[in-house]
UniProtKB/Swiss-Prot annotation:
GO terms for biological process: cytoplasmic microtubule organization. GO terms for molecular function: microtubule plus-end binding. It comes from Xenopus laevis (African clawed frog). This is CAP-Gly domain-containing linker protein 3. One of its GO terms (cellular component) is microtubule plus-end. Residues 1-16 have a biased composition (Basic and acidic residues). Functions as a cytoplasmic linker protein. Involved in TGN-endosome dynamics.
Length: 534
């Protein structure tokens, strides 16, 4: 679609053909809208886009017969070859007698709009964009002009494409007029809203330095901090974006002035308080049943500081799949639960669930979990040896599962590997897992500062604290030849945690009386089959 602003043109201009304007033409006093045209390309050209670095394309660019609409068509091509030469192409347009505020008929954008867009990092070149912008401002370019399609002015474009260099140039030329101007396409938000919603950290910092209002509200009554994307909604492949979102939101929240006369230093800060002390002050502990917002029931799995936001947060495994994650946010795992059953919330949002009285309604009883280690025929000595081994190796506090040497694990919710070491080290205090990764994405071969803790290929070794390690399956080297018992162990490991009263051993049940022995012989095979099928 084309748009011609005929009333804006003078009678002398209407006599000239729009396809060509002489470079000797005197500058017009009023801007016009140029009709759209296709981008010119050399004959037998191998590419579909215009490359100003190509000699044949340079000849077209410098040819006076190349019209302003054709040059606008070249600028519209969103490729680095064109955008890096925005200052040269813009100068050629001005040489052809174009008014500094003339518009492209296809996009309704001015040269200043295109210059701000061309400053985008990656595709454009901020230095070239600043050169053209300075030239346009000296010629009297109007910063307040908006594209009729997007309702964005030059400052909005610079904020949208995260070009702090251009923002400084524009605000220096016309700071009061456009600093807090709004845009209808972004819910009547300011340039700060536009930058915040697109995670443009550099643009937000620049706007704050020049006095932009961090408390300005859009048509939805949102301040810029409210439109920052939620890090918890980002997948594992967007860990960097999650970190930017966290920093950006905190920056905007800190910039909002306090609504009371108390200095910020008097506000409480719980970031340095351990999570267990925070829970103890509330009469809670990990594993307790809690209510979130007095509505959603779940189990408390985590309490402490996080990477996605400041302050103390609790991680809850909901009973129903009404959550947002599986216990990990931005590639960092805080606890383990099924997908869509994990959720994070401030400590103030949870309360202890009331104790449920035992129900008198008769229903089909659930199969109680049996401690199969007591029916495998192992003696007391073997049990003690196994228990001692478990204590000598690290354990992950997740449903009471032990992580042993040789187990397949997941490090930081991302990298798979096998546990080769657990214990204290010389390079850091506390207990550490030494893990041989499946891929060479580690840091060493099992030795740190000349001390060898385990042996693996170069770049396959990594150390991690127990909080960053989760078990993926049974031990790497099976401890028993009984395949059935191994399968039962793996099945019961993945079941939800249940709390029962003390389960009596088969021996205790059988020793009560003859009737108990008969019931036991009938009940135990059925129980074993049911547990294995589940």
């Amino acid at each position: 679609m084309t748009r011609e602003d005929l009333p804006d043109s003078t009678p002398e201009e209407s006599k000239l053909p729009m396809e060509f304007q002489s470079p000797l033409l005197e500058k017009r006093r009023r801007p016009v809208v140029h009709p759209s045209a296709p981008a010119p390309l050399p004959k037998d050209y191998a590419f579909t886009f215009f490359d100003p670095n190509d000699p044949a394309c340079q000849e077209i660019l410098l040819d006076p017969q190349t019209s302003v609409p054709e040059l606008f068509a070249i600028i519209r091509q969103w490729v680095p070859q064109v955008q890096h030469k925005i200052d040269i192409i813009g100068s050629e347009i001005l040489k052809r007698g174009c008014h500094v505020n003339d518009r492209d008929g296809l996009t309704d954008m001015t040269l200043l709009h295109y210059a701000c867009k061309a400053g985008a990092h990656g595709v454009g070149d901020p230095a070239a964009a600043v050169r053209l912008t300075n030239q346009l401002l000296l010629l009297g370019a109007d910063i307040t002009l908006r594209s009729r399609w997007t309702n964005m002015n030059a400052l909005h474009y610079a904020a949208y494409f995260d070009v702090p260099e251009l923002l400084r140039t524009l605000l220096k030329a016309s700071k009061p007029k456009v600093l807090n101007s709004t845009c209808s396409d972004f819910n009547h938000g300011t340039a700060m809203h536009i930058a915040a919603s697109n995670l443009c950290l550099g643009a937000v910092k620049c706007l704050l330095e020049h006095g932009a209002n961090p408390s300005a509200r859009n048509s939805k009554s949102q301040v810029p901090a409210d439109v920052v994307p939620d890090p918890m909604d980002m997948g594992l492949d967007k860990a960097d974006s999650a970190m930017i979102a966290k920093e950006l939101k905190q920056l905007l929240l800190d910039a909002v002035p306090l609504t009371c006369n108390l200095p910020k230093i008097t506000l409480p800060n719980y970031d340095n308080i351990p999570g267990n002390l925070m829970l103890a002050s509330l009469g809670l502990k990990l594993g307790d049943r809690i209510l979130l917002d007095a509505e959603k029931a779940g189990t408390l799995r985590f309490c402490g500081t996080t990477e996605f936001a400041s302050g103390q947060w609790v991680g809850v495994e909901l009973d129903e799949p009404d959550g947002k994650n599986d216990g990990s946010v931005g590639g960092i795992r805080y606890f383990i639960c099924p997908p869509k059953q994990g959720i994070f919330a401030p400590v103030s949002k949870i309360s202890k669930a009331p104790d449920q009285p035992p129900s008198s309604v008769t229903s089909t009883p659930r199969t109680p979990r049996v401690d199969f280690s007591r029916v495998t025929g192992k003696g007391r000595k073997e049990k003690k040896a196994t228990h001692k081994k478990s204590l000598s190796v690290g354990s992950l506090d997740r449903e009471g599962l032990k992580i042993e040497i040789g187990d397949q694990v997941l490090v930081a919710g991302q990298k798979q590997g096998i546990v080769r070491f657990y214990g204290k080290t010389d390079f850091a205090p506390g207990y550490w897992f030494g893990i041989e990764l499946e891929k060479p994405t580690g840091k060493h071969d099992g030795s740190v500062f000349g001390v060898r803790y385990f042996t693996c290929s170069a770049k396959n070794g990594v150390f991690a604290p127990p909080s960053r390690v989760q078990r993926m399956g049974g031990p790497k080297d099976p401890q028993t030849d009984n395949n059935d018992m191994k399968k039962v162990h793996q099945v019961t490991m993945t079941q939800p945690k249940r709390n029962f009263t003390k389960v009596r051993t088969p021996k205790e049940i059988a020793s009560e009386n003859s009737m108990s022995r008969i019931l036991f012989c009938c009940w135990f095979p059925w129980l074993l089959r049911a547990e294995m099928k589940s």
